[in-house]
Amino acid sequence: GCCGAFACRFGCTPCC
């Protein structure tokens, strides 16, 4: 899974 602010910054969506 891709969760966390760092994940969002890496273009991982949707963000948890």
From Swiss-Prot:
Coiled coil: none annotated. Disulfide bonds join C2-C16, C3-C12, C8-C15. The keyword Secreted applies. Keywords: Disulfide bond, Secreted, Toxin. GO terms for molecular function: toxin activity. Expressed by the venom duct. Is present in all duct parts with a highest content in part 2 (proximal of the venom bulb) and then decreases in concentration toward the end of the duct. Contains 3 disulfide bonds. It is found in: Secreted. Its main location: secreted. The keyword Magnesium does not apply. GO terms for cellular component: extracellular region. The cysteine framework is III (CC-C-C-CC). Belongs to the conotoxin M superfamily. This is Conotoxin tx3d.
